[in-house]
A protein has these predicted regions:
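Membrane-interface alpha helices of multi-pass inner-membrane proteins
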Residues: 214-217, 233-237, 244-268, 379-387
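Multi-pass, polyprenyl lipid-linked donor-dependent membrane glycosyltransferases
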Residues: 175-179, 195, 204-232, 237, ...
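Perimembrane helix-loop-helix junctions
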Residues: 263-293
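Transmembrane helical bundles and short interhelical boundary loops of multi-pass, membrane-embedded
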Residues: 2-56, 273, 283-288, 296-384, ...
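Transmembrane-helix motifs of polytopic, lipid-linked glycan transferases
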Residues: 13-14, 61-71, 171-195, 228-229, ...
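Transmembrane-helix signature of polytopic, membrane-embedded enzymes
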Residues: 75-82, 185-210
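Loop-to-helix entry region of an early transmembrane alpha helix in multi-pass inner-membrane enzymes
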Residues: 50-54, 149, 153, 163-186, ...
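Intramembrane catalytic core of multi-pass membrane enzymes that act on lipidic substrates
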Residues: 76-178
């Protein structure tokens, strides 16, 4: 297809996508009209668990992903990666129909700004009962923040400019998410302009047009996109040879949400093995570990709640909609719930460690290549979400997807994660609506989870085991 014809088709498909983002995900769900609903609601409740609602959701997702995968096969004009800013602008006004985290961010910041409550130590329940927005915390009312001080300060920074107005703060947090999304798209392009210029536009499009990315950032405003933008900034600095800046940016990412600390060992190994002698490497690894630790510890120290009260550690309790939850449900009748949890944790964490170790062994001769830390980062984050996350959430895929697009749209990493983003969206109506239609699937939690987790993971595993690995050239 010629570029001119491709451009015409692109604009037509952009119009189709915009109509779906507006008609299915925004038109009936204006944030300004719905944000006062207590307790907060989701897509299924807003559409009254209707067949029309579930059909619109599934059809919309399928069409959006159809457009998405079509784009990745075509020659595209340079402005293509930035068309989704229109979609993001539409979703900016939408109620977060897939998760209530946006409200929790705002409530914890209210506690800090108005009542001087440390969000890392204090749950929303500590706010005065008279606070008009307290009940929007819903099931998270007794949970302190599992995030880092960079995120809490960022949320606080937009509280005063809107004079503490709750709706204004929600929109400001959405603005932060969209700004981080735009920064991520630019960083992907600039990284690829150095490592693989021929992939630049497709890499940007692969991230920017992905429906899960757009819905979880522009609509639901998860702070994961801020963490991801800083992770990509760290990779950008690594690619540009700015070693200490790379460590600083990764530390800032960790101080938004702690999961990206899993990338730190691979970044440090790469930076170390660039050096010419063993002496320089040994010295550097001690220096890099020490300085990175200080970059993380010093900012969090004034707000740290103590190990016993740290929400990051408490978040591992319980499980749902995940492989771990399915295993616990299968074993608890024989072993009891606590033992079943222990068995599944040891099993899945062991499998995760084995996969990461095997990948590290495969890449042992490429530790000074730019693709090595990116591939290892993808491996540890992707398989964490797929295997060991006690509760699976679709936005967890932002972590690994941001790295997958840097490895090329024909790579196993990208294809598997792209399919994962599709199944993560399609499984939502099953868990939220279909199981309500058929209460047997709610009452028989094991069967309900087997079906849901199969929808979520089996297509992904098929792609992984049937796709040949591509090897990036040395950069």
């Amino acid at each position: 297809m010629t570029l001119k014809k491709s451009t015409s088709t692109l604009l037509a498909l952009a119009l189709v996508s915009e109509l779906i983002y507006w008609g299915v995900f925004t038109r009936l769900f204006w944030l300004k009209d719905l944000y006062k609903i207590i307790p907060p609601v989701d897509y299924a409740k807003l559409t009254h668990y209707s067949a029309a609602g579930i059909f619109a959701f599934i059809a919309g997702i399928i069409v959006l992903f159809g457009v998405y995968f079509w784009l990745l096969r075509e020659k595209l004009p340079a402005f293509t990666p930035y068309i989704p800013l229109i979609f993001a602008g539409t979703l900016f006004f939408s109620y977060p129909t897939l998760a209530i985290d946006l409200f929790i961010y705002a409530i914890r910041t209210r506690g800090w700004a108005l009542y001087h409550l440390n969000p890392l130590l204090t749950a929303p329940a500590a706010l005065p009962a008279s606070d008009p927005w307290l009940k929007l915390a819903a099931e998270w009312i007794n949970a302190a923040s599992p995030y880092g001080p960079v995120w809490e300060v960022l949320s606080l920074s937009v509280f005063n400019p809107v004079n503490g107005d709750f709706l204004g703060h929600l929109f400001a947090l959405k603005g932060i998410a969209i700004a981080a999304y735009l920064l991520s798209v630019w960083l992907i392009g600039d990284i690829l302009s150095v490592t693989h210029p021929e992939w630049k536009i497709w890499g940007q499009v692969a991230f920017a047009w992905n429906p899960l990315v757009l819905l979880e950032t522009a609509q639901n405003a998860h702070n994961d996109i801020v963490m991801v933008a800083l992770l990509l900034a760290s990779v950008w600095a690594m690619v540009r040879g700015k070693d200490h800046l790379s460590l600083l940016l990764l530390a800032l990412s960790v101080l938004v949400k702690f999961i990206t600390i899993l990338f730190a060992p691979f970044l440090i190994i790469y930076l170390t093995f660039k050096l010419p002698t063993k002496f320089h490497r040994y010295t550097a690894v001690v220096w890099y570990i020490g300085i990175f630790a200080l970059m993380v510890i010093i900012p969090i120290a004034p707000m740290f709640p103590g190990w016993d009260d740290w929400a990051v550690l408490q978040a591992t309790h319980g499980a749902g909609r995940s492989l771990m939850a399915t295993g616990v449900l299968a074993l608890e009748g024989w072993l009891g719930t606590n033992t079943a949890f222990s068995v599944m944790r040891w099993t899945l964490y062991g499998l995760w460690a084995a996969i990461v170790g095997w990948r590290a062994w495969q890449l042992r001769t490429r530790v000074n290549y730019l693709d090595a830390p990116i591939k290892m980062g993808w491996t540890v984050l992707f398989w964490y979400a797929a295997l060991v996350a006690p509760v699976f959430h679709g936005w967890y895929l932002l972590w690994s997807f941001s790295l997958a697009v840097l490895l090329g749209i024909h790579s196993r990493e990208f294809l598997a994660t792209a399919v994962f983003t599709l199944t993560a969206m399609l499984v939502i109506p099953y868990f939220e609506t279909v199981r309500v239609w058929y209460p047997y699937l709610l009452n028989n939690a094991l069967l309900g989870h087997i079906i849901g987790v199969s929808i979520l993971l089996l297509p992904v595993l098929y792609v992984i085991f049937t796709t040949r690995e591509n090897v990036m050239r040395e950069t």
